[in-house]
A protein has these predicted regions:
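Histidine-centered catalytic micro-motifs
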Residues: 52-63, 190-199
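Histidine/acidic residue-rich metal-binding segments in metalloenzymes
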Residues: 38, 123, 149-261, 273-289, ...
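Active-site gating loops and adjacent loop-to-helix segments of metal-dependent hydrolytic enzymes
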Residues: 64-95, 102-105, 128-129, 133-142, ...
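His/Asp/Glu-enriched, well-ordered alpha-helical/loop segment
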Residues: 231-235, 277-366, 382-385, 392
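Active-site beta-loop-alpha junctions enriched in small/polar residues
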Residues: 59, 117-118, 137-141, 169-175, ...
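Alpha-helical scaffold segments that flank or form the walls of functional sites
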Residues: 48, 66-129, 151-161, 415-419
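Active-site metal-binding motif and surrounding structural segment of the metallo-beta-lactamase
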Residues: 35-50
Length: 437
């Protein structure tokens, strides 16, 4: 039995525990309570123990894309990344995805929901010990492309850790036909899609106008993105919809009626000038919602602390109410809320007996949040990757400050970025990528 203790333990599903402790063995939590009862074990002063953070929308394969197309409107930005992606192959995607997985663990993230072009994100997550769902992206008109995803899933499953589950990601309504959406859903695996992210998407589906027309083969339906999928029976509880910025009350009701989960990505939406999702209305409708960082292609980092702060600012600014989203509510969106969005709430997202021992220790030493008043607010507004001391997945150390540097991994990813910057476009390899031995 191993015990960790800290000034505060935040179970999320229960009341904060001052001078709390978490006991665990064999990958699961045995007990959560006062350190006076469980023992101190390894003690973290001026710190908080929280559930491992859950990032509900990532693209690990874009971990080195920072700055590409910055300042461009959504349509041209999309074109920039389509062109850049064609410059590298399978091994480079894997090198980049490994960096993305390492950055998640180093920032306290233990679980991800990733949309992966090559499948490299699944291998990287498995190698480095992340938990998650990695959905293989599909694009285009032909329903047969779902068979490509099926084959990729079959090729990858034997090399993956059991913590990583594979899914399928029909990219978006403007890049995937309804026939391919349906074929992808029929695979019977989790579904990740981008939905109602921008006004460009709305314009294109409505009447074929706007910059997306330069890259899309999909015939406009005359409907908004949510109504487009709903009209074809393509909404359901297996769907995790990233963004949902451009939605009205009727569309929110449709999402709720079909129990669609939403990944809320306020920094990405702000960086691309798309606006902010109506978080208050989405929450009021009872939707399952988790926070996601998206990728460094559209946001600076995989930092969920920054995402929590952005969610608070966006909610309060949009609603013009200082209580539109409290610190503890933002923390819930990055833990238990995101776990619900992934249908993993029985296993992760909160600290309790029988749950997976996915834990993050955050130090607030030297911060203006000490002495303590509200430990949840302190984590949300004072936390950062630099303050993460320890990240455990199934009770196994996957990051400890000062102990995991990943120098070789960083060099390989930097070399891949250099090729993204300078190599002439080629057809990217999407052959299965093998894990390191």
């Amino acid at each position: 039995m191993r015990v960790l203790s800290a000034d505060w333990v935040l179970p999320v599903a229960g009341a904060p525990i001052e001078r709390g402790a978490v006991a665990f063995e064999n990958g699961r939590i045995a007990d959560v309570g006062p350190a006076s009862e469980l023992g101190e074990g390894e003690r973290f002063a001026d710190s908080v123990i929280v559930p491992g953070l859950v990032n509900a929308h990532t693209h690990l394969e874009y971990a080195v894309y920072s700055g590409f197309g910055d300042g461009q409107p959504f349509g041209p930005w999309l074109t920039t990344h389509i062109e850049r992606k064609a410059r590298i192959g399978a091994e480079e995607f894997l090198a980049i995805a490994r960096l993305g997985a390492a950055e998640c663990l180093g920032s306290g993230v233990t679980t991800i929901a990733d949309a992966s072009f090559s499948g490299a994100a699944a291998v990287a997550a498995s190698e480095l010990g992340l938990r998650g769902i990695v959905a293989i992206e599909v694009f285009g008109l032909e329903a047969g492309r779902a068979d490509d995803a099926r084959r990729r899933i079959a090729e990858l499953e034997p090399v993956l850790d059991s913590r990583v589950r594979l899914g399928v990601s029909p990219h978006a309504p403007y890049s995937v036909s309804t026939e391919l959406y349906r074929a992808a859903y029929e695979l019977g695996v989790p579904v990740v899609t981008h939905l109602a992210e921008s006004e460009d998407e709305v314009d294109y589906l409505r009447d074929g106008s706007g910059p997306i027309s330069a890259v899309s083969e999909i015939a406009p339906s005359g409907l908004t993105p949510v109504r487009h999928l709903a009209a074809h029976g393509l909404l359901g509880p297996q769907v995790l919809a990233a963004h949902c910025v451009k939605v009205d009350e009727e569309e929110i009701a449709l999402l709720a009626e079909h129990d669609v989960a939403v990944a809320h990505c306020p920094r990405s939406n702000a960086m691309l000038g798309c606006g902010f999702a109506p978080l208050a209305a989405l929450r009021a409708a009872g939707l399952r919602i988790g926070l996601g960082t998206d990728s460094p292609a559209s946001t600076p980092s995989f930092d969920l602390f920054e995402e929590m702060r952005a969610a608070v600012l966006a909610a309060r600014g949009r609603e013009e109410k200082p209580d539109a989203l409290a610190g503890w509510e933002a923390l819930e969106l990055a833990t238990l809320g995101a776990a619900r969005a992934l249908h993993l709430e029985d296993e992760i997202g909160s600290l309790g007996s029988g749950k997976r021992a996915d834990l993050t220790v955050v130090s607030l030493a030297g911060s203006p949040y000490l002495p303590w008043e509200d430990p949840a607010a302190a984590v949300v507004f004072g936390g950062s990757p630099d303050r993460v001391l320890l990240t455990l997945v199934d009770g196994e150390e996957r990051y400890r400050k000062g102990g995991f540097e990943w120098h070789e991994l960083r060099r390989s990813a930097a070399a891949a970025r250099a090729r993204l910057l300078h190599r002439k476009p080629t057809r990217p390899s999407v052959e299965p990528v093998a894990p390191r031995t």
